[in-house]
C-alpha cells in the first residue's frame, strides 16, 4: 500500500536550516539520501521532495466569479509542510518505521531533528469510467 509521509516544521525559525553549518547540512542530506537509496533498492521508494518555504506559498480557492489567490499558508497555522516522501510498503508499521528514520536524521551537532511526520495511506477509489 502507498503512504505519504508529510514532514512538517514550525513557521517560527523557518530559516533555521540555512543557519546550520555546511557540515551539519551535508550530514543531514547524506542520511536522507541513504534512506532513499535503501528504499529504492527494496522497491519501496516512490518519490520524495522538499518544498519551498511558506513565504512562497499561495492558497487558491475556486469560488464563484473566479479563483482568488492569497499569499502564504493559513495565518493561524503554526506549522507548514517541509516536504514529503511517498513509499509503497506492505504494512502501516513499515511506513511508521521509515518515518521514524527520516525524523531521526541528524540536525545541528548531530542531534536528531525529530521533525514531526504525518503518515497517511492513499485512499482507494474507483477509476473513472471512460
Where is each model-derived feature located?
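Conserved, structured core segments of small domains
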Residues: 1-130
Amino acid at each position: 500500500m502507498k503512504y505519504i509521509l508529510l514532514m512538517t516544521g514550525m513557521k517560527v525559525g523557518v530559516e533555521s536550516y540555512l543557519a546550520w553549518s555546511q557540515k551539519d547540512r551535508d550530514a543531514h542530506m547524506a542520511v536522507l539520501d541513504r534512506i532513499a537509496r535503501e528504499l529504492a533498492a527494496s522497491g519501496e521508494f516512490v518519490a520524495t521532495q522538499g518544498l519551498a518555504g511558506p513565504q512562497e506559498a499561495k492558497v487558491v480557492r475556486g469560488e464563484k466569479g473566479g479563483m482568488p489567490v492569497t499569499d502564504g499558508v493559513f495565518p493561524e497555522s503554526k506549522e507548514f509542510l517541509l516536504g514529503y516522501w511517498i513509499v509503497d510498503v506492505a504494512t502501516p508499521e513499515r511506513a511508521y518505521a521509515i518515518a521514524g528514520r527520516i525524523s531521526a536524521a541528524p540536525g545541528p551537532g548531530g542531534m536528531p531533528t525529530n521533525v514531526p511526520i504525518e503518515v497517511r495511506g492513499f485512499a482507494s477509489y474507483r477509476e473513472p469510467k471512460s
